[in-house]
């Protein structure tokens, strides 16, 4: 069969690339404190297959995993953790559901969660320490799945990676007129939306 023939050939029958390139392959990009699901598995398996083929052809491959580790949901999670210091976060999915239920039903909690996001974005040390704890627990879960799938060599860049870079981007968008204020928020409209 074709598969058997490929297995006996050098590089499984894939020709070496005429020009070596550096290629970035995006993987599953799961969200901290949430379960990985079928959509994450699909992109992980396809991404890994592509990365392996590209490496066999001689390319340098960056296996990028852009993790959802920043944003509004962390205010909710961190505030829930602060209110329940003895709570177990080993089951982050259950912990997330509890926090979300409180966020949806308790106005005071919702306001404190929003304030906690601001503390996180400003780099409050206590908030950052709790945030790292949540991220670390999730990474253990993610790594167990990647190990089971024999996925190796992922380079993680979370959304948090860009936090200290955003101020300059926002200033540039404002200065050039690309961003504008609408309903109290700084936004960038697509030309067709104007």
Range-by-range predicted roles:
Residues 1-194:
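NTP-dependent nucleotidyl-transfer catalytic core
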